[in-house]
Amino acid sequence: MSASASSLSAFNPKSLPLCVSRPASVSVLPPSLSFKLHSDHLVSIFASSALKCSSPAEYPSRFVRNVAVSSDFEVEEDDMFADGDDSAPVERNSFSPDLKLFVGNLSFNVDSAQLAQLFESAGNVEMVEVIYDKVTGRSRGFGFVTMSTAAEVEAAAQQFNGYEFEGRPLRVNAGPPPPKREESFSRGPRSGGYGSERGGGYGSERGGGYGSERGGGYGSERGGGYGSQRSGGGYGGSQRSSYGSGSGSGSGSGSGNRLYVGNLSWGVDDMALENLFNEQGKVVEARVIYDRDSGRSKGFGFVTLSSSQEVQKAINSLNGADLDGRQIRVSEAEARPPRGQF
């Protein structure tokens, strides 16, 4: 059973009428919701606190009057299509994947009700899900809309791809989401990131990224990662190079001229990051960090320049600058603390 499904089992369903005093408002709902639209069912709310309503007669709109509300914050694509428990209140497997649209570059203020209202003009909306981070509770800037027919899916994709909504152009793709990038992120006990011999990706058993036991990182032999205990190393580090490591003294691309770049739009990739910083100096490396399971951007990255003067110039010029609709944060990168300090 997936982590999302397990988290649902901790909640006891309660059937309650949903009502608000002002029909135009949907503020009665929590921000982290998955909406499933029906015609003749009560509202099932799964949450740790109950809503109190004096009358079931008034509803904010037809998009929220009969809604199955899930306590999930973050829903991975595999969970959306996996066979769920028979007792699960929200059946994510009830619609064909071909009827689902991916909607990206959402404003963080957009919730499922607003998205449903938008897509109504393209046809009959069956389900809307805006995905939220399960740690912060903040929207991750994307969601899914399920239509009732393939023709409506095509019409919605044509109508809304590139459509500006709440100040941001939407990215709308028809069909199921792309497969996870398992070919890029090996997860075996002796595997790792990009072409490493015994190290590699993100936290593998004997290699990998951040604070691993025996190193990892990008293309290293046994190095890489941030603050590894025995074989550390920066991106593409040598056998005993380190970036905040317990052993070794740094090589690879080094940390002295490395910048942290945060609050990136989900659509920004390595090339976009490199092009932005090319104006500030010679870019040695530009890399956006991706989630190991979903393959999606984690919203931050690192840029290495050739000199400390270029680093300061980049900070002064680009910290707070607008990139793809978001104000980026630029600062000098620091070594992450050892695992015991988290």
From Swiss-Prot:
Disruption phenotype: No visible phenotype under normal growth conditions, but mutant plants exhibit increased sensitivity to cold stress. Residues 99-177, 257-335 form the RRM domain. Its main location: plastid. The keyword Kinase does not apply. It comes from the Eukaryota. Residues 167-255 are annotated as: Disordered. Residues 178-256 are annotated as: Linker (Gly-rich). Residues 190-237, 245-255 have a biased composition (Gly residues). It is found in: Plastid, Chloroplast. The keyword Repeat applies. Keywords: Chloroplast, mRNA processing, Phosphoprotein, Plastid, Repeat, Ribonucleoprotein, RNA-binding, Transit peptide. InterPro entries: Euk_RNA-bind_prot, Nucleotide-bd_a/b_plait_sf, RBD_domain_sf, RRM2_NsCP33-like, RRM_dom. GO terms for molecular function: RNA binding. GO terms for cellular component: chloroplast; ribonucleoprotein complex. Residues 1-65 form a transit peptide. It holds the Pfam family RRM_1. The modification Phosphoserine is found at S107, S204. One of its GO terms (biological process) is cold acclimation. Stabilizes specific chloroplast mRNAs. Required for normal chloroplast development under cold stress conditions by stabilizing transcripts of numerous mRNAs under these conditions. This is 29 kDa ribonucleoprotein, chloroplastic.
